[in-house]
């Protein structure tokens, strides 16, 4: 069971974007892509076959999953734990103990 899932609101705890918040767009084995975080400029060639123009585009790159933490109700970073309730595994915030939706 992954501790961070698509759609979770996270905060960056280390790196150049430390303190910024965003919503998880994609989750990989060890990396997460967060909306508006870790933007890089990518130079794109024009491609008339696809109908794209060339130029410089901002692209969101993945972050390591250890560099982000979930945001609790108080707006602070929280670690995530996993416990069994009624025979099912559920995620909970370690700071508040609040159970996250399945």
UniProtKB/Swiss-Prot annotation:
Gene: rplX
NCBIfam families in the cross-refs: rplX_bact
PANTHER family: MITOCHONDRIAL RIBOSOMAL PROTEIN L24 (PTHR12903)
Protein name per the record: Large ribosomal subunit protein uL24
InterPro entries named among the record's database cross-references: Rib_uL2_dom2, Ribosomal_uL24, Ribosomal_uL24_CS, Ribosomal_uL24_KOW, Translation_prot_SH3-like_sf
Organism ancestry: Bacteria, Pseudomonadati, Pseudomonadota, Betaproteobacteria, Burkholderiales
MF term (GO), any: structural constituent of ribosome
Family indicated by similarity: Belongs to the universal ribosomal protein uL24 family.
One example of a Gene Ontology biological process annotation: translation
Organism annotation: Burkholderia cenocepacia (strain HI2424)
């Amino acid at each position: 069971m992954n501790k961070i899932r698509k759609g979770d609101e996270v905060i960056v705890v280390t790196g150049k974007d430390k303190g910024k918040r965003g919503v998880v767009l994609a989750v990989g084995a060890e990396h997460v892509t967060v909306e508006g975080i870790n933007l890089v400029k990518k130079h794109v060639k024009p491609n008339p076959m696809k109908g794209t123009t060339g130029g410089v585009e901002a692209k969101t790159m993945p972050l390591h999953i250890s560099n982000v933490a979930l945001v609790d109700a108080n707006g602070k970073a929280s670690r995530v734990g996993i416990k069994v309730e009624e025979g099912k595994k559920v995620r909970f915030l370690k700071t508040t103990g609040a159970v996250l939706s399945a």
